[in-house]
Each structure stands twice: as structure tokens, then as C-alpha cells.
Amino acid sequence: FARPSIAASVLAFMPSFQIHRSNRLERLVVALGDLLADGVGGPLTPEAVVVQGRGMEIWLGGELAKRFGVWATRMEYPRGLVDRLVREVLGDAALGDAPLSEDLLGWTVQAVLPELLAKPEFAALARYVERDEHGVRAFELAGRIATVFDQYLTYRPDWIRRWEAGDLSDLPVDDQWQGLLWQRVAEQVKRPHLAVAVDQLIERLGEGKPLPGLPPRVLAFGLSTLPPLYVRALAALSRHVDVHVFSFSPAPGLWPPK
């Protein structure tokens, strides 16, 4: 089992960010349980335990119930935690009552796409839906585009920011329809989205001022992957509260030096 460790270059910027690595999930559960047993903020203070998905949530809840006899703490997924941090630090207005969701993106793409198909940049899409008598292809295409746009908001927010600023220079000619379509979608919905809100969150956390509403600490368990946007948010959060990441590393070569 590798003891909590982090490179000195990272430690200088993230004094409360600790990574726990092991090639055995069971050992990571023991380390997590030891931290939970210590408690922070009193027995009624809710812990912020973050997992990748429903499967890990069920398994980890069962393991912790074996240790403590009962386990009733609600676990969160990464996007849910980031969304909550945005609302706590920046206020509900940062995301609005109905933030930009994948479903809303899908309906908006379907609504604005027909008016864009005459443009030369959309020639390939126009050919795809030209014999779509019942609108099935257009509906499915809008859904697939919405899924990709939603992933861009999480994994490539830099693209979204450039497109919204009118800069499509990063796109090949055949892909420029994506930037043009996003500009039209953003103009149509006029709602805040997570990429911009997280940038504002990171900036606010980086100011170093005390902030109300933050969790006493964050315990992230078994995350196999995490978007860079969320990593930056956790790094900024670690300036205020302890952030522990319990990482499953099957190969000893991936562990840090002792």
C-alpha cells in the first residue's frame, strides 16, 4: 500500500491535496474508513464522498456499512459536486434555475439547425437529412450533436469559449459547422453553462478568502478518469479544505517513490 503522497511541485500549489494509491481497492476502503472514523465538524456534519458512478456507489456503501454497521451518507458524482460548489460559492444565478442540459441542447439544435443547412459549411449535414421525410434523421442527429456539445462543455471548455468569442481558427474547414452551430445555440438559449461557471468558481477559490458553504473536506474514491476542468476545480478547492483522492493503481510502477 502506498502511503499518501504527492510530488513536491504539486504540493506547493495544493497544500491540502492528498493522493492515496493502492493496487487493492479493499486497502483503499480501509484508508477511507480511517479518515471517516476521525470525522470532521461533528457527527452530524455530512461528508462529501465522490464516486464515479452508481456501481461504485453501491459497492463502496456496502463496504463502509460492514465497517461502521450502518452507512447512510449520500454520495455524489463529480459533476454533481462541481455543480453544488458553483451554487454555494457563486450563488444560484451562476447556473440559473434551468442550466444548459443535454436535453435542452438537443431540442435547441433541432430547432435552429434547419435555418443553417443552406450555408456551405453545413453541406454534409444537409445531404444527410435531405430525404428525411418524417424528421427521424434530423431528430437523431440533433441528439448526437447535443451529446457531443455536452461533452465539449466538460472536456473542451476552451473550444466553447473560443467559439463564443467568434474564433473558429482551431477548426478544420469541414468542421467549422460545429462552431457556427454552437454560436447559434448559445444565442438561442441565453443560459449559463458549467464551463463558464467553473472558470468563475476557480477564480473565486483562488482568491484565498474564506467562503461559506464549502464542504469540510472532499473524499474522492475510485475515480478512473476526471475531466481537467474538474481537476482544476478540486485543486482550487484544496486551498480551502482537504481534498483526498483514493486512486486504484494496479501497476506498482505507477506508485510514487516512498
Region annotations inferred by a language model:
Residues 20, 52, 222:
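Small/polar loops that bind or transfer phosphate-bearing groups
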Residues 13-36:
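N- or domain-start disorder-to-order transition segments that initiate the globular core
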Residues 51-212, 228, 235, 241-242, ...:
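Basic/charged alpha-beta structural segments of nucleotide/phosphate-handling enzymes
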Residues 1-13:
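Short, Lys/Arg-enriched N-terminal segments with co-localized hydrophobic residues
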Residues 214-226:
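Conserved P-loop NTPase "ATPase switch" module shared by AAA+ and STAND
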Residues 27, 227-231:
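Domain-scale recognition of functional cores that engage charged ligands
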Residues 45-48:
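Short active-site oxyanion
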